[in-house]
């Protein structure tokens, strides 16, 4: 489980680096649209909890969070196959698992 959350946070570092490179005019390996969405999210970051400590559902639908959860879950699924015990936000439904499967297929094709 710790590996899962490390992967999630490492993905945030990657996102941030892509935003930094894009802003500096450097070539990036991520589509411009994704980077601009990440930049928007970082500039108006929504916290996971509301003032009353209740869960803020909007947090989970930021592009940076969806991407980080998909990446970390897909990496774990690719490596370990059975990942039923990993945390998936209840806000996510089939669209999340469809995105994960697409990433796992990319990993398969690349022979990682």
Task: Give, region by region, the residue ranges found by the protein language model.
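Catalytic Zn2+-binding segment of zinc metalloproteases
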Residues: 9-27
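Short pre-active-site segment immediately N-terminal to the catalytic Zn-binding motif
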Residues: 1-6
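Metalloprotease/metallohydrolase-associated module, dominated by Zn2+-dependent proteases
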Residues: 30-111
């Amino acid at each position: 489980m710790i590996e899962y959350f490390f992967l999630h946070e490492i993905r945030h570092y990657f996102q941030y680096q892509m935003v930094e490179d894009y802003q500096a005019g450097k070539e990036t390996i991520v589509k411009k649209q994704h980077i601009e969405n990440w930049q928007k999210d970082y500039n108006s970051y929504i916290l996971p909890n509301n003032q009353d400590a209740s869960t803020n559902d909007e947090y989970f639908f930021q592009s940076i969070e969806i991407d980080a959860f998909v990446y970390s879950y897909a990496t774990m699924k690719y490596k370990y196959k059975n990942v039923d015990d990993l945390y998936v936000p209840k806000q996510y439904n089939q669209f999340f698992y469809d995105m994960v499967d697409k990433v796992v297929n990319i990993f398969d094709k690349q022979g990682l």
